[in-house]
Amino acid sequence: GKGGALAQCGGNALVQGEADGSSFPSGGLRSTFEARGYTAWDVTSPAYLMESPAGMVLCIPTVFLSWTGIALDKKTPILRSNQALNQQAARVLRLFGVEPRMPISSNGGLEQEYFLIDSNFVSARPDLLIAGRALFGANPPKGQEFDDQYYGVIPSRVLGFMADVQRQLYRLGVPVKTRHNEVAPSQYEIAPTYESGNLACDHNQLIMTVLRKTARRHGMSCLLHEKPFDCINGSGKHLNYSIGSPEVGNLFAPGDNPHENAQFLVFLCSVIRALHCHAGFLRASVSSASNDRRLGGHEAPPAIMSLFLGDQLTD
């Protein structure tokens, strides 16, 4: 108003923003001039500061919607599914005389596997540079018989990389817990502490970002492709999943007498029923060219949706 420069950014400017959404699938329900999309701060996931050579950047977890409310991102469906989960889980708990006062949500522990390859070797392979996986090459001398890597000592160069990654993730608020060798040669794993599903997904994205950036600084390339090499194990993203809250605990916990724990059996049967009725949707949610190449070959999970309850519950 007085011709001066704006030198501040208020909180209201961060809570909601407007971005172009014309290139995102909005269901064809907009007029040609309605190209806008909206971002909104997801306050359930903490903001963080990401350091880069250009300076410090404030990163705010957000949802991205079309002007009609259609989700244009992958965070909104998670938040909406948690809402639906809370409503239905609370409804079932009331049948057992439990009135939950705290929201019930999904919880997850995402274990991230990856390959570390020296950058000099990767630079000599255009397929690794472009596709992130080997398109040709000789078979390894062993397949599933490899055990010297998994039960061996972590190489000092890799251990230095892991320690660097862990320090950076702690600064970003990611509670990483374990780091170890994996089965295939040059394959490793990092896993965070179990946490709420929405936060676990955000932290997994941060873990993958930090792994790639840090590997370059250590003269290595981090391959996150699910199946970068044939005839040896690929890299999975094992998800330890449950539902519950601090108030009601883990609703998948069987207790001392699972056969007599009616509440546990009801929630267990709901998962079995959901898998039976919606196997196609669940399979599609993890379907991609890279993951479909991994499933069913030198791996534990098959290419179909399956469920194993263990001998005790099956009997």
Cite the ranges covered by each PLM segment.
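Glycine-rich, acidic/polar active-site loops that bind/position phosphate-bearing ligands
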Residues: G1-H225, F229-D315
